[in-house]
């Protein structure tokens, strides 16, 4: 996806999207290893926030013309991930 972005976005939007995606999985992993449900839920909430960041950044990239309408599948998958994380949080609370 990010390969189609302009070169000047390499350290801007591309970098931010990549950091946000890494943040999602890293927070889930760290939270699951914390040993308490309360901590896990806290890290899941951070992962959820990062998932919303990714969605916003992807939509921005589409509006700026860096990505095509065909990339809506990625946004849809991000929305599915948000729902899964949200449902897990609700189940654990």
Where are these regions (language model features)?
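Amphipathic alpha-helical assembly/interaction segments
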Residues: 1-93
């Amino acid at each position: 996806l990010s390969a189609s972005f302009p070169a000047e976005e390499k350290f801007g939007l591309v970098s931010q999207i990549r950091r946000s995606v890494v943040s999602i999985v890293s927070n889930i992993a760290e939270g699951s290893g914390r040993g308490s449900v309360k901590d896990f839920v806290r890290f899941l909430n951070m992962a959820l926030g990062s998932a919303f960041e990714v969605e916003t950044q992807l939509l921005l990239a589409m509006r700026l013309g860096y990505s095509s309408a065909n990339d809506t599948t990625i946004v849809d998958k991000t929305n599915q991930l948000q729902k899964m994380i949200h449902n897990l949080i609700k189940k654990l609370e």
